[in-house]
């Protein structure tokens, strides 16, 4: 795609004369002679653009045309014969040629077919016409006529009704909205052509804005509450009205913008919109017309309306099929003032959502709640997929309640008609009062169209039964007094039965009203009510508004623990969504900035941050961004074609409702760059989706800078890590604004806890929160939310039975203590707790190795006890240890005991567990285990049998261990310090390890776990014998002297053999002791077993190990000495 270039022609260039020749052609472009092209090129400092607006002038007549790059075969200007006839340019005309500078790009162009035949041909070839218009026509102005070729032979002629901007010549660009006014065959001979032209003229194209509760009017009704929706009023900002020459209380017709099916990216969404616009008429039979609904409204000025927006009540939006933040046309309207009052019908109605063939649900939108279900054996015809029908008895209930307050004269009206008449009075009174209260002008008439929409909210109705006498399914409304916050909503449509209005789409009828008894709030509309009848129920097909639910999205102000991250995201989204920023990028040819990628571990708050930022711009009056949340994890198991369809629809919706924020939550669940799937079908799908998203973002950036009509979009994606998505997606200009959310620190955890407690309207002291935050190391935002819920459950149990006189409940330390009992954070579900593993109690569980215990205590306990002192230390602490020594000398045991003694979490990894046959999988396993340790900090990360995964590089034929060693080096002394993570490794062959791992900053502290000496063996035997039943006279010191060369594991095996021998001795005794006694290890028995047991490591093997350790230490010493010598060439 190429950007549009601007050509700069000096103003003093003289006009060139040329002759116009008409030729056979199938577009509305001209071919210029080569001499003229050379002259234009010589006056420009850059190459000619692909599209050049040109003005041809002959005397007082002017024609605006476009050149698209072709040159004529002669010295004359060549133009298609049909196009020349349309613009009345005779063949052979001598014209002066001038380039039109700075032609504005059109946002909206309204055209009309010249004849009814043209309109009918267009209806049959709508998609073909839209695809062809940009390739055939690029320059237009009001009143201009032009042809359009279909299949290179069929010609449709149009005339331009209006353009926006409306002054002078405009050019069509990708994104320009082309509205086609229908040209139907004249069935109403009395219709006035001038009025029809005025009606079809689009006065404005505005974006729909949500209203507040002021869009309802309180009605004076006894016995219950009744609120009337202002469905005959639309609110507009005064500056917007002035811009479009609109006046207060002006009568306008509003209809949704439903563009033709256009670009490939919009196809699916626009197809769905067109189907949503179709109406289901009375008795459920589908209407033959596919035109959008329209409503006749009065304009009221309000500063609450944003500029460029139109505020309408939600039910009216659903009736029109105009979703929130969509676009609507404002047109003129004809009013029949002198006609006789026609017959009117008032029909109850309900919305049917075309998105999922279900009536609108309360949880998604406020209308069409549970009163839309009834047990019925007669579903409406034409809706075979619609099983349950509206309980129309709800409408009857309200009408019956109102009948007692209706007309007080003695007539033939039944209760239903009285109630309907009074309901119509209330609706009329509410509309008039609202207009008068805002504008200060008393309006004496209401204008109704062919269909007028009524919407009422009722509260406080007594319980009722359904028609068949069974309890109603509307349980939440069975007692309105019990739930004052849940309104009962009823809808009606008033239809004008006037055949003369059928040919006039934008016609309205003037209902003159008499409010002489204003003090009594009475509106006299008897002439209208006399001709009103109760119509059949109507099912209105509508579009479900898919905007993000504000109720579950947090505010930016509540994310205090995220600090500057929030402000950075807001700044980038401001640049992406601001129209002023887009103008600067386009003006100075600056590429559009990239979009936002939030990454971090699960539960770190990625979704919360994205939703809060989106909500901020959704509520910002200058933008009112449309928010779309796509949970990609729910699409993970779907086929690629379905995911492509969903993403296409979402992007089309975002473009249609721009400015928009599109949140792609858990994007890595559908687009992941895993080496395991390389070459598989899943990999092909990932490639397709990646290419689709990159193409969309690139194309959007190009169109955004070069064309108008494309509104601003901001993509926000969340993933767990940058490595999990393809680099092409996170490169410059795409998702290049990376935001990392790490595990929260103590202060951040305290802020999260405070926010969660306040969100539940509870209290807790600051001291408790600070102490709790310090204990919740490794907890993320999700874990803390669950913890608060558990504390609330504990508090409820403490307060039971609930005391009604307490206005606000407090959480105390006891509640959180109970909540933390047996609670394991998500990141630590497979991690050993700080309590001992395998029965370890702490340092008292370790015998001997005093020097090693002291070294580990110094490394682990001191920073924990005095964190402020060590925080001021400018040097990096030595927190990595290599334990080496003969087998069975307690290397693994002492690390586990250290974790228990220091209350640290313990992550133990056996070396071979990390190795994987797939390329890159072993390195990924190393990265994952270090990430898990960082999330679980403070903790000990222990690698047993370290020599099996980190041998010297260059000795592995496969190269797997070489890459693992490289990854270890990166993790151990990377740029990011592993705060709170103590890395321990154990091996019996340190000489096999790669020397780079033992250098300073890595595993630079070496501790030898040697065979225990006699005093150490005595300590080990004492510790191991605590849980054994031994005779009182047993002496362990001789045993310690007898077991020379035994390791700690050998001593444990010795005691196990002694215990087993005691059992056999007990069973072999002839005089069995009493039942319940246990075998006892005696001193002779223990000495006997010790004299028979041999150490597991022979003297030869021991000497071999000592030689290896000596050579290992000598090699390290010689390498350090070599570093101190200066190399010379002497």
Curated annotation (Swiss-Prot):
Q: Which CDD domains match?
A: AAA, RecA-like_PEX1_r2
What species was this sequence derived from? Arabidopsis thaliana (Mouse-ear cress)
Q: What GO terms describe the biological role, i.e. biological process, of this protein?
A: fatty acid beta-oxidation; protein import into peroxisome matrix
Taxonomy, superkingdom: Eukaryota
Which SUPFAM superfamilies does the protein's record reference? ADC-like (SSF50692), Cdc48 domain 2-like (SSF54585), P-loop containing nucleoside triphosphate hydrolases (SSF52540)
Reaction equation(s) it catalyzes? ATP + H2O = ADP + phosphate + H(+)
Give the record's GO CC terms. cytosol; peroxisomal membrane
Q: Does this entry carry the keyword Magnesium?
A: no
Q: What induces it?
A: By wounding and avirulent pathogen infection. Systemic induction by hydrogen peroxide.
Q: Which Gene3D superfamilies match?
A: 1.10.8.60, 2.40.40.20, 3.10.330.10, P-loop containing nucleotide triphosphate hydrolases
- SMART domains, A to Z: AAA
Q: How does it assemble?
A: Interacts with PEX6; forming the PEX1-PEX6 AAA ATPase complex, which is composed of a heterohexamer formed by a trimer of PEX1-PEX6 dimers.
Concerning PROSITE patterns, the annotation shows: AAA (PS00674)
**Chain's role:** Component of the PEX1-PEX6 AAA ATPase complex, a protein dislocase complex that mediates the ATP-dependent extraction of the PEX5 receptor from peroxisomal membranes, an essential step for PEX5 recycling. Specifically recognizes PEX5 monoubiquitinated at 'Cys-11', and pulls it out of the peroxisome lumen through the PEX2-PEX10-PEX12 retrotranslocation channel. Extraction by the PEX1-PEX6 AAA ATPase complex is accompanied by unfolding of the TPR repeats and release of bound cargo from PEX5.
**Which gene name does the record give?**
PEX1
Question: Cross-referenced PANTHER family, in alphabetical order?
Answer: AAA-FAMILY ATPASE, PEROXISOMAL ATPASE PEX1
Single GO MF annotation? ATP binding
InterPro entries listed in its UniProt record: AAA+_ATPase, AAA_ATPase_domain, AAA_lid_3, Asp_de-COase-like_dom_sf, ATPase_AAA_core, ATPase_AAA_CS, CDC48_domain_2-like_sf, P-loop_NTPase
Protein name as catalogued: Peroxisomal ATPase PEX1
In the Enzyme Commission scheme, what number(s) does this protein have?
3.6.4.-
Q: In which tissues is it expressed?
A: Mainly expressed in meristems and young developing leaves. Expressed in seedlings, roots, leaves, flowers, siliques and stems. Not detected in root tips.
Give the signal peptide, or none. none
Q: Where does ATP bind?
A: 600-607, 885-892
């Amino acid at each position: 795609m190429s950007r549009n270039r601007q050509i700069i022609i000096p103003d003093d260039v003289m006009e060139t004369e040329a002759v116009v020749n008409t030729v056979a052609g199938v577009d509305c472009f001209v071919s210029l002679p080569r001499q003229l092209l050379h002259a234009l090129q010589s006056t420009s400092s850059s190459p000619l653009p692909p599209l050049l607006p040109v003005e041809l002038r002959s005397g007082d007549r002017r024609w605006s045309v476009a050149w698209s790059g072709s040159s004529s075969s002669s010295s004359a200007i060549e133009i298609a014969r049909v196009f020349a006839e349309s613009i009345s340019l005779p063949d052979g005309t001598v014209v002066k040629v001038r380039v039109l500078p700075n032609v504005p790009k059109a946002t909206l162009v309204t055209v009309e077919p010249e004849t009814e035949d043209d309109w009918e041909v267009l209806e049959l070839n709508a998609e073909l016409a839209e695809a062809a218009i940009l390739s055939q026509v690029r320059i237009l102005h009001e009143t201009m006529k032009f042809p359009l070729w279909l299949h290179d032979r069929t010609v449709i002629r149009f005339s331009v009704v209006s353009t926006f901007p409306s002054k002078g010549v405009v050019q069509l660009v990708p994104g320009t909205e082309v509205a086609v006014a229908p040209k139907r065959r004249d069935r109403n001979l009395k219709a006035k052509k001038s009025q029809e032209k005025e009606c079809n003229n689009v006065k404005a194209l505005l974006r729909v804005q949500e209203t507040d509760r002021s869009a309802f009017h309180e009605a004076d009704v006894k016995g219950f509450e009744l609120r009337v929706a202002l469905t005959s009023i639309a609110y507009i900002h005064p500056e917007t009205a002035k811009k479009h020459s609109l006046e207060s209380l002006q009568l306008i017709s509003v209809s949704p913008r439903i563009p033709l099916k256009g670009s490939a990216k919009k196809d699916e969404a626009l197809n769905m919109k067109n189907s949503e616009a179709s109406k289901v008429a009375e008795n459920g039979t589908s209407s033959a017309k596919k035109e959008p609904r329209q409503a006749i409204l009065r304009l009221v000025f309000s500063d609450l309306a944003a500029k460029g927006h139109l505020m309408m009540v939600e039910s009216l939006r659903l009736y029109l099929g105009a979703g929130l933040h969509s676009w609507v046309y404002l047109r003129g309207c004809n009013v029949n003032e002198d006609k006789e009052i026609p017959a009117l019908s008032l029909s109850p109605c309900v919305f049917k959502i075309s998105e999922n063939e279900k009536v609108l649900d309360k949880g998604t939108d406020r209308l069409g709640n549970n009163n839309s279900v009834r047990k019925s054996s007669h579903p409406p015809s034409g809706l075979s997929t619609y099983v349950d029908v509206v309980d129309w008895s709800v409408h009857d209930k309200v009408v019956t309640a109102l009948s007692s307050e209706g007309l007080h004269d003695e007539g033939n009206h039944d209760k239903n008609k009285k109630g309907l008449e009074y309901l119509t009075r209330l609706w009329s009174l509410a509309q008039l009062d609202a207009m008068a209260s805002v504008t200060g002008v008393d309006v004496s008439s209401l204008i109704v169209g062919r269909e007028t929409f009524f919407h009422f909210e009722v509260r406080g109705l007594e319980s009722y039964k359904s028609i068949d006498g069974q309890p109603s399914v509307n349980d939440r409304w069975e007692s309105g007094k019990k739930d004052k916050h849940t309104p009962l909503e009823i809808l009606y449509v008033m239809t004008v039965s006037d055949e003369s209005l059928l040919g006039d789409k934008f016609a309205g009828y003037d209902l003159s009203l008499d409010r002489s008894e204003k003090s009594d709030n009475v509106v006299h509309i008897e002439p209208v009510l006399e001709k009103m009848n109760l119509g059949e129920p109507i099912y209105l097909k509508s579009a479900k508004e898919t905007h993000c639910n504000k109720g579950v999205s947090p505010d930016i102000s509540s994310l205090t623990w995220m600090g500057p991250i929030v402000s950075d995201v807001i700044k980038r989204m401001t640049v992406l969504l601001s129209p002023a920023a887009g103008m600067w990028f386009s003006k100075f040819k600056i590429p559009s900035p990239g979009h936002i990628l939030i990454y971090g571990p699960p539960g770190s708050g990625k979704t919360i941050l994205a939703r809060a930022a989106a909500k901020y711009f959704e509520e910002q009056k200058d933008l009112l961004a449309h928010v779309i949340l796509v949970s990609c994890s729910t699409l993970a198991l779907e086929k690629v074609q379905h995911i492509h369809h969903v993403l296409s629809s979402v992007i089309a919706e975002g473009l249609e409702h721009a400015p928009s924020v599109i949140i792609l939550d858990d994007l890595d669940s559908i687009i992941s760059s895993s080496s395991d799937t390389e070459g598989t079908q899943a990999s092909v799908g990932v490639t397709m989706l990646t290419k689709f998203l990159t193409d969309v973002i690139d194309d959007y950036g190009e169109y955004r800078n070069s064309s108008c009509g494309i509104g601003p979009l901001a993509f926000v994606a969340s993933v767990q890590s940058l490595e999990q998505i393809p680099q092409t997606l996170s490169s410059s200009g795409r998702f290049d604004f990376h935001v990392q959310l790490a595990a929260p620190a103590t202060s951040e955890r305290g802020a999260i806890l405070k926010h969660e407690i306040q969100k539940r309207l509870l209290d807790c002291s600051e001291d408790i929160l600070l102490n709790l935050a310090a204990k919740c190391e490794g907890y993320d935002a999700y874990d803390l939310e669950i913890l608060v819920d558990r504390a609330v459950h504990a508090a409820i149990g403490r307060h039971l039975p609930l005391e009604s006189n307490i206005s606000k409940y407090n959480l105390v330390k006891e509640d959180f203590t109970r909540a933390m009992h047996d609670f394991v954070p998500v990141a630590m579900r497979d991690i050993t707790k700080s309590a001992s593993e395998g029965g370890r109690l702490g340092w008292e569980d370790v015998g001997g190795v005093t020097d090693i215990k002291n070294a580990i205590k110094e490394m682990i306990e001191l920073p924990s006890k005095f964190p402020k002192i060590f925080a001021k230390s400018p040097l990096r602490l030595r927190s990595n240890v290599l334990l080496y020594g003969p087998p069975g000398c307690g290397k693994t045991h002492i690390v586990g005991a250290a974790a228990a003694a220091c209350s640290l979490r313990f992550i133990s990894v056996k070396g071979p567990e990390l190795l994987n046959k797939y390329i890159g999988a072993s390195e990924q396993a190393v990265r994952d285990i270090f990430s898990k340790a960082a999330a679980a900090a403070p903790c000990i990360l222990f690698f047993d049998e370290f020599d099996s995964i980190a041998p010297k590089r260059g000795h592995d034929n496969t190269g797997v261990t070489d890459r693992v060693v490289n990854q270890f080096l990166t993790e151990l002394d990377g740029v990011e310090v592993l705060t709170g993570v103590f890395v321990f490794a154990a091996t019996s062959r340190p000489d096999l390890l790669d020397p780079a791992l033992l250098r300073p900053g890595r595993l630079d502290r070496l501790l030898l776990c040697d065979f225990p000496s006699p005093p150490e063996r005595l300590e080990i035997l004492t510790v191991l014998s605590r849980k054994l039943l031994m005779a009182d006279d047993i002496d362990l010191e001789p045993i310690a002297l007898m077991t020379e060369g035994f390791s700690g594991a050998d001593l444990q095996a010795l005691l196990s053999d002694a215990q087993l021998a005691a059992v056999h001795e007990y069973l072999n005794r002839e005089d069995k002791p009493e039942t319940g006694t246990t075998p006892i290890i005696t001193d002779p028995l223990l000495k006997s077993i010790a004299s028979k047991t041999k150490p597991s490591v022979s003297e030869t093997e021991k000497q071999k190990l000592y030689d290896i350790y000596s050579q290992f230490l000598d090699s390290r010493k010689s390498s350090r000495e070599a570093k101190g010598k200066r190399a010379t060439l002497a």
